[in-house]
């Protein structure tokens, strides 16, 4: 059972996002030890979209920029290099204590020392994302979009971005665009807004066609009971994850596809990585397999991106979860936060466990 997509669209995938910068100490060193660091463009939503954009599908990013900022220029150049169109207003900085693109300061960890992430989001310009700044009738009607991917990160950033995501979902529904929703719960974003965000997330989930989250996301965003978050022995918990998805399906029956990833951390550079997907009445399970991890950030985004690419290509559902699993595994071998596949074969080679040199 596939997902019937709208035809004759300018864009296969559209993502709303707040673009920012990640600062990563070199050689897996901790932030507090100082030294050299790498600065790179990042956002969870463009991490998802990168699988499709690198493999040749048309992608558009809806965002906002700080006017005249060299960081904004870096972001625009990066999106172009990833083969993505973008649209967004230019917001005046308002002086040195005004708006900026957020910083995520994150080390990769190494071996027995886990990675640490420090979000520095004061004055984040992405929190001003507002539906009034975008012509949704043009984007979804005249231009046409096959799938819009919404993230709970953007949905919870501010009251404006919450409304923006809600209006995007409503416009998508109006024009026949399929909706993908990755819940992406963050406790710090929800603090003080629990009642408001629960209602908004429930409405988006009720119209979503693809619904993705981990055990914590489903429990804390949608109130659906699931297994204990994280821990060891994930393979033995697969039936518990399935039961959670059954409860999600019962509460939010509009979706045809539900997915969750499975991750057990042996150490920072050695994970067991798996996935569960329900499409229609069929289950597709990738039992946790060993993967080597260079940097874990973006692995879950890679899974969603690979799954959406497979849906957009019209493949059978079994391949959706396989390609998603392998795209997530590919992302963890890169320092960029997002998968940059050379071609489909590179991802399928990871699925097949073939790391032999290609000449």
Q: For each predicted feature, which ranges?
A:
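Charged helix-capping and loop-helix junction motifs
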Residues: 134, 162-167, 193-202
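Conserved phosphate/ATP/ADP-binding segment of small-molecule kinases
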Residues: 189-280
């Amino acid at each position: 059972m596939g997902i019937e997509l709208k035809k004759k669209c300018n864009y296969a995938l559209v993502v709303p996002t707040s673009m920012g910068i990640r600062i990563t100490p070199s050689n897996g060193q901790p932030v507090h030890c100082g030294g050299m660091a790498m600065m790179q463009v990042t956002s969870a939503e463009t991490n998802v979209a990168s699988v499709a954009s690198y493999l040749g599908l048309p992608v558009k990013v809806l965002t906002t920029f700080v006017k005249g900022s060299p960081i904004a220029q870096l972001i625009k150049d990066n999106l172009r290099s990833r083969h993505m169109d973008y649209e967004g207003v230019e917001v005046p900085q308002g002086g040195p204590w005004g708006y900026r693109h957020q910083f995520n300061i994150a080390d990769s960890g190494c071996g027995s020392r886990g990675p640490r992430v420090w979000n520095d989001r004061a004055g984040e310009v992405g929190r001003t994302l507002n539906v009034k700044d975008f012509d949704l009738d043009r984007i979804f009607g005249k231009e046409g979009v096959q799938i819009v991917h919404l993230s709970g990160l953007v949905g919870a950033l501010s009251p404006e971005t919450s409304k923006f995501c809600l209006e995007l979902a409503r416009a998508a529904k109006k024009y026949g665009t399929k909706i993908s929703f990755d819940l992406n719960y963050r406790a710090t974003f929800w603090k003080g807004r629990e009642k408001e965000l629960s209602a908004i997330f429930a409405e988006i989930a009720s119209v979503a066609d693809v619904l993705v989250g981990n055990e914590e996301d489903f429990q804390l965003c949608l109130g659906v009971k699931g297994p204990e978050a994280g821990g060891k022995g994930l393979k033995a918990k697969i039936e518990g994850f399935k039961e959670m998805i059954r409860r999600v399906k019962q509460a939010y029956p509009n979706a045809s596809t539900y997915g969750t990833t499975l991750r057990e951390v042996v150490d920072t550079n050695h994970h067991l990585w798996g996935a569960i997907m329900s499409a229609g009445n069929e289950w597709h399970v990738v039992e946790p397999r060993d993967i080597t991890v260079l940097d874990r950030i973006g692995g879950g985004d890679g899974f969603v991106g690979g799954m959406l690419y497979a849906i957009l290509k019209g493949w059978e559902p079994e391949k959706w979860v396989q390609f998603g699993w392998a795209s997530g595994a590919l992302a963890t071998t890169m320092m960029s936060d997002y998968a940059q596949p050379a071609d489909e074969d590179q991802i399928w080679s990871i699925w097949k466990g073939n790391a032999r040199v290609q000449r």
